[in-house]
Amino acid sequence: LREIAFRTAGGGTGKAVDIDEFDTMENGCRQLIVWNPEDEEIIGGYRYLYGRDWRTDKNGQPVLATGHMFRFSQQFMRDYAPYTVELGRSFVSLDYQNVRGNTKSIFALDNLWDGLGALIVINPDCRYFFGKMTMYPSFSKRGRDMILYFLRKHFNDDDKLIVPMQPLEMVTPEEELA
């Protein structure tokens, strides 16, 4: 379902099944599924992995789907990783996306986020969510820059806990975003 949802938007893996080594490895990713019991349909889902289950490589870096994108500081690994959940591969099934113009879509994201809240209730030692998000090249650069500006202004990582290997540069002048 995730592959179908992303392929429709111009993304996806192109494979028949959207499974990788992080799904199949020992103590691999788990799946959060949001279910509509009335229609017996999957609304959406997230792939997740508890920090306490992360494996590390010979350099002390976590073996994660985001591992090729970021460097994780020793402080992060010591003080935050055990209480963090890596999120990825989120999706909303096509029938529950607002672009379809149907009423099924009204609570799809809310239900998905309620599921994330349930992870915290079930596992009270989890305090943080971490993950990446996809923005396709067709997404407005100005729109992307507005998101980057907001995140850097209000949630900047001054301690360099997690550092991107290839940081995104804003193309929109900052004074236009302030």
Language model regions located:
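Short amphipathic alpha-helix that is part of the acyltransferase structural core
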Residues: 1-50
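Acyl-donor binding region in acyl/amide transferases
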Residues: 51-178
